[in-house]
């Protein structure tokens, strides 16, 4: 039995209800961390369909990750509208559209999706340069090619962009050398009749711009569009969105400028902040700042991180809807190993008191911080899993699966690897945990690298904010006074974000 309109709205706060009932676009929703963003968006879609304001078959919601799209579909299913509403990532939505229109516009078969772009980058590099080929170089070149594509920068434009913005090509290449690699990569794909994931979006844009029949066919299935995580939209994704819409203005965007943490990969909050100028007048412009996830102590800590920004006044100030919790713990350790041991011991104490290891997370700024944590957790006989940008990697002290399982069994841990999460801050986005331990809060780690100012520093501030707001019940923030390296011990300074 389908839920009634009023049942769909039941349990929403005033701001969430106002957003859910604003079914005519354009609508902007600024949703802070823990403010019930997905709940509000899915209720809005369900409410519009239940009241017959929208046709579910012409309704599409797009987001950035497979996990987020699956969560949206799951929630819509419980509201009896998932069968007809399309909830997908940008790339899966565009790929579906491309497959639908390809037979009508092209005689030959559709190109294959490149399964190993890294191999193509390596072949391209070897073909055009004598540069040393290693994993870091290949990874950096692949990332730069991706950045060019989502930033709508062609090989012909690259050198000019570098000169205008002082951008340095990766791995010590000159702009002209990178352009040669970029062109060779494109040629290699063409020779293989392959396209990469960014090409999918580029081709759909091109077809819609060059063929009005194609544009009309695609737009006929998108009368109402919802875009999640709009603060992370790239120029390429923005271009695709505008092609999907045409003259239609039934669009709702949802995002949070304070959670823009992928600028290095081409994302920008500009489209979110400039939405009213581009699509206005807006029918609704709503802020969701009631945090249902974190305690007041954690929320206040997060607010202080953002309030110290010297250049941004557009961040939402969160207000916790939870009862008072434990104060945020700030701990200073003597060394990285002492920090890892101390955090592992605290988690061991939580688990011994009845908490689940899966409710605990250790957040790091970079992957390199994670190995020592694995060792410390192993010594405490704690299960763990490591999350990098590419996803989950169940890990222990050995990379061999059988050895790893045998080791866990010998420690009395067992083969169930659903344990403590060790994650980079970037990879933790969209997740939440009862107990969060944020380590390495020193200058050079967060903020990362040499002292920076302006937007680079601001992105590091937002990273700190994202890390803090992953915590539900408790937050432990720490740093180590010294680090050990090839040159012996070196002193560290506490992070400017260590509040």
Protein language model regions, located:
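Conserved helicase NTPase motor core
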Residues: 5, 10-21, 25-30, 60, ...
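Helicase P-loop NTPase motor core
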Residues: 29, 35-41, 281-284, 290-384, ...
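Conserved beta-strand -> loop -> alpha-helix junction used to position metal-binding or nucleic-acid-contacting
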Residues: 84-97, 116, 382-397
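P-loop NTPase Walker
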Residues: 1-107, 216, 246, 300-303, ...
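ATP-hydrolysis module of ASCE/P-loop NTPase motor domains
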Residues: 22-23, 84, 103-194, 285-287, ...
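Conserved helicase C-terminal RecA-like lobe
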Residues: 370-387, 393-499
């Amino acid at each position: 039995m389908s839920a009634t309109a009023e049942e769909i709205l039941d349990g929403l706060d005033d701001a969430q209800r106002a957003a859910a009932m604003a079914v005519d676009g354009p609508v902007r929703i600024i949703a802070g961390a823990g403010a019930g963003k997905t709940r509000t968006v899915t209720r809005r879609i369900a409410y519009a369909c239940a009241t017959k304001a929208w046709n579910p078959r012409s309704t599409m919601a797009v987001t950035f990750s497979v996990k987020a799209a699956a969560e949206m579909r799951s929630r819509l299913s419980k509201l009896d509208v998932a069968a007809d509403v399309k909830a997908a990532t940008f790339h899966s939505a565009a790929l579906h559209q491309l497959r639908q229109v390809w037979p009508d516009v092209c005689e030959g078969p559709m190109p294959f999706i490149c399964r190993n772009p890294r191999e193509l980058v390596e072949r391209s590099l070897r073909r055009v340069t004598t540069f040393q080929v290693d994993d870091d170089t290949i990874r950096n070149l692949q990332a730069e090619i991706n950045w060019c594509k989502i930033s709508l920068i062609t090989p012909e434009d690259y050198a000019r962009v570098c000169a205008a913005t002082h951008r340095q090509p990766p791995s010590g290449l000159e702009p002209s050398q990178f352009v040669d690699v970029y062109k060779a990569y494109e040629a290699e794909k063409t020779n293989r009749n392959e396209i990469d994931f960014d090409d999918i979006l580029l081709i759909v844009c091109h077809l819609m711009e060059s063929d009005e029949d194609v544009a009309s066919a695609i737009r006929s299935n998108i009368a109402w569009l919802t875009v999640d995580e709009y603060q992370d939209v790239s120029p390429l994704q923005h271009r695709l969105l505008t092609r999907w819409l045409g003259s239609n203005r039934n669009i709702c965007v949802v995002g949070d400028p304070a959670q823009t943490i992928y600028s290095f990969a081409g994302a920008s909050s500009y489209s979110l902040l400039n939405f009213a100028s581009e699509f206005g007048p807006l029918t609704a412009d709503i802020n969701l700042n009631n945090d249902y996830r974190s305690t007041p102590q954690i929320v206040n800590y997060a607010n202080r991180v953002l309030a110290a920004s010297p250049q941004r006044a557009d961040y939402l100030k969160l207000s916790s809807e939870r009862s008072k919790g434990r104060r945020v713990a700030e701990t200073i350790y003597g060394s990285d190993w002492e920090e890892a041991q101390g955090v592992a011991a605290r988690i061991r104490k939580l688990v011994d008191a009845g908490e689940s290891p899966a409710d605990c997370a250790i957040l790091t700024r970079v992957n390199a911080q994670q190995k020592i944590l694995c060792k410390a957790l192993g010594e405490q006989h704690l299960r763990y899993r490591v999350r990098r940008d590419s996803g989950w990697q169940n890990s222990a002290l050995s990379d061999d699966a059988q050895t790893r399982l045998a080791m866990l069994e010998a420690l009395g841990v067992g083969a169930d690897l659903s344990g403590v999460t060790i994650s980079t801050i970037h990879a933790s986005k969209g997740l939440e945990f009862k107990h969060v331990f944020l380590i390495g809060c020193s200058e050079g780690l967060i903020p990362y690298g040499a002292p920076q100012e302006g937007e680079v520093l601001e992105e590091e501030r937002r990273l700190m904010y994202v890390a803090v707001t992953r915590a539900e019940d408790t937050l432990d923030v720490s740093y180590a006074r010294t680090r050990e390296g090839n040159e012996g011990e070196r002193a560290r300074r506490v992070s400017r974000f260590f509040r």
